[in-house]
Amino acid sequence: MDTVETLEGKINRSDYKILIVDDVVSNVLLLKILLTNEKFQVCTANNGTACIEMARKEHPDLILLDVMMPDMNGFDTATVLKKEEGTKDIPIIFLTALNTPQDLVHGFQVGASDFLTKPFNKEELVMRVTQQISLVAAKRIIEKQNQELLATLTNRDKMYSVIAHDLRSPMA
């Protein structure tokens, strides 16, 4: 638990973008106000198709996705997002009035990272969003450390190659 608290303390929320997707304008506005007050960057879409386009264009760090929308529902939208290389790793929190075990299972099967049931509690929303953003931040740290480690290993191998060459052909 200390590691998560420490990581959350290091997170600059303004570095993270959240895509809010809901066909009900009042829900979008409420979520936008809540998350901008928490210092997150926010972009919005009002349907599944617009969500997919916005995710491709904006590369959000998290998507809050309504399930019950006309044309393309949230489950179908998530399925498309999880199949595309550029969007497959974006965590998705479903916002839904659906709360049966079958709905939850289906949501996780199509790629949900978490669920929030409508009507949602503000504090719970902020905590779940912060938790997902913490995981995104941790993943970024791990990826950066892996790149640094690979660079170190490459340099080490070059150094070993030079040493081996020098040992095979000493100066006269």
Question: Where are the model-predicted features located?
Answer:
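Non-catalytic signal-transmission and effector/linker regions of two-component phosphorelay proteins
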Residues: 1-19
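The feature encodes the CheY-like receiver
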Residues: 28, 70-73, 88, 100, ...
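Acidic catalytic/metal-coordinating carboxylates
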Residues: 26, 46-50, 73-79
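Short amphipathic alpha-helix used as the core "switch/output" element in two-component signaling
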Residues: 53, 75-88
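Active-site beta3 strand of CheY-like receiver
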Residues: 58-67
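Two-component/phosphorelay signaling modules centered on CheY-like receiver
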Residues: 25-43, 57
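Primarily the dimerization/phosphotransfer
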Residues: 147-172
